[in-house]
Amino acid sequence: MSNSIVIQTNSTVIEDMKQQYKHSLSPKTPQGGIFMAKVPSCTITAYKSGKVMFQGGRAEAEAARWQTGSQTPKTAVKKAVDSHRYTPPASIGTMSIVGSDEVGTGDFFGPMTVVAVYVDAKQIPLLKELGVKDSKNLNDEQITAIAKQLLHVVPYSSLVLHNEKYNELFDKGNNQGKLKALLHNKAITNLLAKLAPTKPEGVLIDQFTQPDTYYKYLAKQKQVQRENVYFATKGESVHLAVAAASILARYSFVKQFNELSKKAGMPLPKGAGKQVDIAAAKLIQKLGKERLPEFVKLHFANTEKAFRLLK
């Protein structure tokens, strides 16, 4: 039986949702709506009023992903963003800090990679000279050239969540936001251990969710970094440590992606567009559907679209 669930939330969470469902957005938006997205067995519609409707067989499960920490009054959200515990100090750009960023969350094929990097304040001019900036503004060739130099310049911790493990964890009820939080915390923890006794002046995470939600995701973890941890959207423009992390994460992702293409015996496209659906359909024909979890993030709408192409 089809269910219908409505939650009341705020514009910040709705923007997070729109980002999460960006590869499943419908071109049609109802009157008063902000977006409509269709994922397997559920349609999500967000309205300007702050209401979000979930319809379909998986409505309850999909709504549950957003109910924890999302149905908060505006004052609570303001506190989460503006609190001195989370907002970077004005001087952070010149501090010696750890920065972390992730790559691969919007790609159907390929893993998720997270990297944490420590940049001493004295290294900032050198990183600028190397051309360090947000990896989204660099092509793969530039990424490789800069990354190969960075590997010998900055201390870092790099983690890769391969597709099979990603799908296994997702099936156990871990949404992508939680998986990102777990990897960021682990990479930061690993790097701080590597740096000891050197103690960074702070940690800057490229913000992908509300800080309070980030820490809720980590509630069951034994080691959680909280001291001088800051969050900022577009963190790569706040400190070069995040930009360096972005480059190394992209470098790792590209290497893993190329290996995956070799394993598939065919070139695999990045992103989550129509060409991805076609490639996935070819891969299913070539290797069989049982091997798909080795290559893709199964919860993406592309999975259903690929199988539809085979009918």
Curated annotation (Swiss-Prot):
Its EC number is 3.1.26.4. The keyword Cell membrane does not apply. A divalent metal cation binds at D101, E102, D206. InterPro entries: RNase_HII/HIII (IPR001352), RNase_HII/HIII_dom (IPR024567), RNase_HIII (IPR004641), RNase_HIII_N (IPR024568), RNaseH-like_sf (IPR012337), RNaseH_sf (IPR036397), TBP_dom_sf (IPR012295). It catalyses: Endonucleolytic cleavage to 5'-phosphomonoester. One of its GO terms (biological process) is mismatch repair. Its cofactor is Mn(2+); Mg(2+). It is found in: Cytoplasm. Manganese or magnesium. Binds 1 divalent metal ion per monomer in the absence of substrate. May bind a second metal ion after substrate binding. It comes from the Bacteria. CDD domains: RNase_HII_bacteria_HIII_like, RNAse_HIII_N. One of its GO terms (cellular component) is ribonuclease H2 complex. One of its GO terms (molecular function) is magnesium ion binding. It is an enzyme of class 3 (hydrolase). Pfam families: DUF3378, RNase_HII. SUPFAM superfamilies: Ribonuclease H-like (SSF53098). Keywords: Cytoplasm, Endonuclease, Hydrolase, Magnesium, Metal-binding, Nuclease. Residues 95-311 form the RNase H type-2 domain. PANTHER family: RIBONUCLEASE, RIBONUCLEASE H2 SUBUNIT A. NCBIfam families: rnhC. Endonuclease that specifically degrades the RNA of RNA-DNA hybrids. Belongs to the RNase HII family. RnhC subfamily. HAMAP family: RNase_HIII. This is Ribonuclease HIII. It comes from Bacillus cereus (strain ZK / E33L). The gene is rnhC.
